[in-house]
From Swiss-Prot:
It catalyses: N(6)-carboxybiotinyl-L-lysyl-[protein] + acetyl-CoA = N(6)-biotinyl-L-lysyl-[protein] + malonyl-CoA. This is Acetyl-coenzyme A carboxylase carboxyl transferase subunit beta. Transmembrane segments: none annotated. A zinc finger (C4-type) spans 32-54. Zn(2+) binds at C32, C35, C51, C54. The keyword Mitochondrion does not apply. PROSITE patterns: COA_CT_NTER (PS50980).
Length: 289
């Protein structure tokens, strides 16, 4: 009987009330979608938005990306005021564009401009998947083509960070046309001996992966990035085969010779610096007048 008096009580975890949960401001904590670890957002930002537990690369917005690779204060933006219209009068498209402008503080899904990496001048374009899933419409294509032409004029390398769901369906054939336009601009840059570095981040799919994203002299990618044209389910239904678990990942593409390297975000700036150093003088072997 005495033994019954000293039975250990079961331990219960205290579940915070809804009011306590509400007292935690939004954005203070971030949950990793891969390992489910919850961490302070400010610590995640200090680590370039890479999970300290599992190494998952969280998406970066355009400005975070530029800050991580360019010399401080060196960036000068191109074509900032360029915005998309609704040439096909697609229902609801203008409202969606306006909502994304307010949400992201961007006018379109790509930011272009020039800056330096270890004092070496480059022209850079960074796609931002928060704006229409980084889809490529007429303005995205035009901004990228103009940036490539600027690199050609300045005789400096062109670097792009891609993150896109592909061509923008609301612009129909006008969006598909950007695949050819950007590719032609890059061909001109290449013919003159210009250096082009493409860095594919998660996700790079559809018409973007099938055009300028895959045309680099160096094709790099971040770990775990989804890279491909059609979706996994569509391919499986077409070929009637089960695809490997790592199909369309950066690591799978590297193993099959479609990438030059998979580069951790911590090492990205230094990797770019080394490539640029090898191609000093802008990588321009022979310039055509």
């Amino acid at each position: 009987m005495l033994r019954d008096l000293f039975v250990k009580k079961k331990k219960y975890a205290a579940i915070p009330s809804e009011q306590v949960r509400k007292d935690v401001p939004d954005g203070v904590m971030t949950k990793c979608p891969k390992c489910k670890k919850i961490m302070y957002t400010k610590e995640l930002l200090k680590n370039l938005k890479v999970c300290v537990n599992c190494g998952y690369h969280h998406p970066m917005n355009a400005w975070e990306r530029l800050d991580s690779i360019l010399d401080e204060g060196s960036f000068r933006e191109y074509d900032k005021e360029m915005v998309s219209l609704n040439p096909l009068e697609f229902p609801g498209y203008e409202e969606k564009l306006e909502n994304d402008r307010k949400k992201t503080k961007l006018n379109e899904a790509v930011v272009t401009g020039e800056g330096t990496i270890d004092d070496m001048l480059v022209v850079v374009a960074v796609m931002d998947s928060r704006f229409r899933m980084g889809s490529m419409g007429s303005v995205v294509g035009e901004k990228i083509a103009r940036a490539v032409e600027k690199a050609y004029d300045l005789q400096v390398p062109f670097i792009i960070f891609t993150a896109s769901g592909g061509a923008r369906m609301q612009e129909g054939i006008l969006s598909l046309m950007q695949m050819a336009k950007t590719s032609v601009a890059l061909k001109k840059h290449s013919n003159a001996g210009g250096l082009f570095i493409s860095v594919m981040t998660h996700p790079t799919t559809g018409g973007v992966s099938a055009s300028f994203a895959s045309l680099g002299d160096y094709n790099l990618a971040e770990p775990g990035a989804l890279i491909g044209f059609a979706g996994r389910r569509v391919i499986e239904q077409t070929v009637r085969e089960k695809l490997p678990e790592d199909f369309q990942t950066a690591e799978f593409l590297l193993e099959h010779g479609q990438l030059d390297a998979v580069v951790h975000r911590d090492d990205m700036r230094e990797s770019l610096r080394k490539i640029l150093e090898v191609h000093q003088g802008g990588g321009m072997a022979v310039w055509q007048s």
